[in-house]
Structures are given as structure tokens and as C-alpha cells.
Amino acid sequence: MPQKNAQDRLWKILTPVLLLLAVLAMAKTLFVGLEIDEEYAFSLGFRLVKGDRLFYTMWEPHQLSALPAALVLALYTAIAGTTTGALLFVRAVVLVCKAAMSAVFYRDFKQTIGRHGALLSAVVLFVYTPKWFLGPDYISQQFHFTVAAFLCFYHYYTHGFRRPWLVVLGAVCACFSFLAFPQSALAAAVIFIGMVLLGRRGKEPTICKIPRGAVLFVLGCMACAAAFLAYVLPGMGLTVFLQRVSLILNDPQYDFTTSQRLALLASQALNTAKFLAKPLAASVVLCLLWWAKTRQKRDWTGLALNLWAILAALLCAVRAVADSSSDERYFMPALVLAAAWAFRKGRGTAREPLFWLGFLPGIAAYAFILRSTLLGFSATFMYLTWPALCGCFAMLACRQENPEQGKLPQGQCVLAALLVFLLVCRFWCVLVTGWKPANVATANLKQITAGPAAGTWADEKAADMQMALYEALEPFAGKQVLQAIGEQYGLGFMMAGGTLTIGQASVISGTDSDPRFIQYYEELPEKRPDVILYDEAEVRDMAAFHAWIEENFTITARYPVTHGTAHLQVLVVD
């Protein structure tokens, strides 16, 4: 009892401190930093707002993630009548949604994993975003809709199969997750199997002898698929739709075989293994010394894995400070292995729905994402965050099941180490274009005062480019714009108060010299641009596409626009 009272007193102090740190960290993220992937997410949604159609006029590889961003942008433009300041608004909406999700998590899990563990977990969920920014890009959507779906399913299966409408709502959230990253749809099969098993073991009501939740999940997904096709197909037809899908799937950036991808991953895995070997060795040595001193009978394997994850996370936090890089996630495989161990002997416990509805679907999704993404091996670890967190929740649940298993709250310690890493990166690192290392001490931050990013602060290069785009495009309200630039500036399409339309096949960086862009104008001549932008500091080989532009478009005027470090060339098309 005295120990419990001491813990309660400690948490009375820690709770406001943790909440304050989380709020301050996310406030910094709300106002500081701008990365090209966040701009890309905004431009995808903006295309739908301006009347572009999925697959027909949008040839984007990630266009299925455009719907949520489009809804929020449409709301903002309807209220404000402009896109000025839209970046802050969308970030704020995402932040409010994250806070609500964390609150729901705390409410549903405080009995299962304890009030203190639920609070710590909720703070981690609030602070974490896959790519650090708040913009609703496809990776962020995949994570957050996955969590939202899980919360719906988990409540249904742990509260006596009441409120079946939660399964339907969860299916809708899951479908948004699958749309954001279609390769993750394999998780649906695992979720279905888990629902069948959980339903039968819990004697859930059935529909046609199949547990009701599993049936509702399938029907919900089918309804979403039907609604999506009803939205996409009118005016295009199935034949054109399938042609567009084939065209987009053949994006040259993703032209690699499974064997080529595996060979690349294997070549990169050695560096990760070298990094993880050090904290693993330290963990084993510490556990051996502990065992030699106490000779206790306990789960030494689980302790070693948890200690490994803790040491690796703290080492990554140190590296993040030293390198000014927020991409130090080498600890995640250790955390996943520790998570997997936490699920042993979990049948019939609170850990079982965590395993079938969270951990295993997350691992299945990661396996297919790993095959299809362009990211390097260590960068893919962001997709392991959700199954790793489910393992942490399982550790906390296990301790609730066996309160006498030891004085050391291992699950809380693992989550605390993860939170330290997240807060260090949030406070110290600054997002800049190209994911280059930058921190609050060295980044030359400037305020953006015009355009959709107005009111935010970014590194000098990014801020100057936003102002240059504003100055270059302000005279062309209502016109159609093409950025013939390798590194696309997605917010540039939203200049001139949101009156511009987009006159190019894709707004993703790196595809502008793709020969499909020529095909785009042949099939959709109405998308030919009125104004074209070149970047004088072009970092990609755009010579072929620029030559085609000069030959096929009648350029009536061209002039430079310079703002600080940004240098653009504006071409006016007849």
C-alpha cells in the first residue's frame, strides 16, 4: 500500500508535466516546419476541391488518399473564401482529431492497462505522427485511420458485443486506411479471421452461422467499395477506369521486382543490425548481472527484450540530438520483438483482442508495404509503430492481470523511452525540405506571411520559396498552372486565393520528365496550362520535359521572380 500511494503521488506530479510537454511539442509542430511531403498531401486534396477527378484527370500514385484532405480544405474555403492560411487550419483540425482519439483511447483502456499506463499511451498517440508533420499525407492517414478502426473494433469486442454500429464505423475507418495505402489492405483478411475467432470464443450472436462482427465488417467494407466506385465511375466508364489504373500502376518510380526490392533491403539491413547489436549486448549483460545477483525466477527473456527496446530508443534520441535528424527509428524492430513476446499465453485475456485486431494486422500490412514502398529499410520502420504500440499495451495489460509479477513496470518504462525519443525530436529537430538535418539552434527560421502557409515558420529556403510562389502566381488568378519542376511545391497550386487550377498529370515530385505527361496533354487537351513555372535551382534532370514544353507550347512571355534564396522563371502560355 505505501508503494501504491507513492506511485499515485508521483503520477499526480507527472500527469500535468506530461500533458504540458505534449501540448507544447505539438504546438511547435503546428507552427514550425514545412516539408515537401506535407505540401504534396495538400495539393492532392486541392485537386478534388477544384474539380479534378480521381483517375480521369488525376494520374497520381497516391490519389486515393486525397479524399480526407479535400473534405477539410473544402470546409475551410467555404468558410474563409480563400486558401490563405489553409495550412494552419488543416494542421489544427488534425491535431484536434488526434486529441479526441487519445481521449477515447484513455477512456477505453484505463481499466485494461491501468490509469497510468493508459495516460502514458494516450500521450504517445497524441505526440506521434509517422512523418512528424501534421498534414494528412497518405502515411499519416494509414496510421490514424488504422488506430480509429481498432478503437471501434476493440470497444465492441471488449464490451459484450454491444453497439454493433461500431463495427460498421470501424470498417469505414479501415477502408480509409486501405485507400491511403492500398497495399495495407491485407490487414483486412487478418482482422476478419480475428473477428471470427473472437466472436466464437465469446459466443457472439451470429448471422448465417458467422459471428455478427465479422459479417458487419465485410458488409461495411463492401458498402464502402460500392460507394467509392459510384463516386469514381460516372462519366468515365469501367474501361477507361481500368486503363487509368494500369497507367498509374506502371509509374516508372515503382518499376522494380520483388527480388530487386528484397536485395536492396538486405543490403541496407546490415547497418540496422550493427546499430541494434550494441543495445542488445548491453541488455543481455545487464540481465545476466541482475540474475547473478538476485537468482530470481522471472521472465528474463521478456526483461531482456524490453530493456533492449528501451536502450535502443534512448540511443536513437541521443543520435537525433547529435545528428539533428528525426529519422532515427532504428529501435523499432527491437520494440516489435519485445511486443511479440508480450502476447505469449494471451488467449482468453485482455491481450487477445489486442493481438488479433491490432498487432497481427499491423504486421501483415507492414509485410506488403515493405515490398511496395520506395523508402529505405530503416525509414519503413514508421509502419511498425502501430504493432509495436499494441505490444506495449499488451505489456501493461499483462501487468494488470498479474499485479505481483514484479515491482518494475516494464511496459511503462518502454513507453516512457519511446516518449522521450518523440519529445526530443519534436522539440529539437526542424522539418526542412528534403528531410535534411536541422534543429532549432541552427535552422534559420523565417515567417511565411502570404499564401496557404501564412502564419507558419519554416527554414529560410522553404519560406523564401513560398513567398516567391505567391509573388509569381498572384497575377494569374483563375488560370491553369503547371510546375515543370522536379521538386514540386504543392502549396504553390493553392496560391492566388485558391483560384488556380492544376494543369498537369501528377503533382508528386520526380515524375515531371515522365513521358506520360506528354500523353496526358494529348488525351486531356483542356488541361494545357496557362502559366508554367521553372525553378532556377532545379535539382532533377528536367531537360527532356522542358524541351518538349518549349516546342509544343506557344510562350508569349517569360520573366524571373526572385525572393531571397528562391529563383523562379514564369512562362506565360498563349
Please give the residue ranges for each predicted region.
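Short hydrophobic/aromatic helix or loop-helix immediately within or flanking a transmembrane segment
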Residues: F42-F46, T57-T82, S177, L491
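Short periplasmic/luminal acceptor-recognition loop of GT-C membrane glycosyltransferases, typified by
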Residues: E60, S184, A188, F427-I508, ...
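Transmembrane-helix signature of polytopic, membrane-embedded enzymes
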Residues: A100-V127
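Membrane-interface transmembrane helices that cradle and orient dolichyl/undecaprenyl
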Residues: Q111-R115, V147-V167, A340-R351
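Membrane-interface alpha helices of multi-pass inner-membrane proteins
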Residues: P130, W165-P182, A188-I193, A223, ...
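Short acidic/glycine- and proline-prone juxtamembrane loop motifs at membrane-interface regions
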Residues: L134-F143
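Short hydrophobic alpha-helices at membrane interfaces in multi-pass membrane enzymes
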Residues: C152-F176, I207-L219, A304-L307, L354-L360
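Perimembrane helix-loop-helix junctions
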Residues: T158, A187-A225, T258-S259, L289-Q296, ...
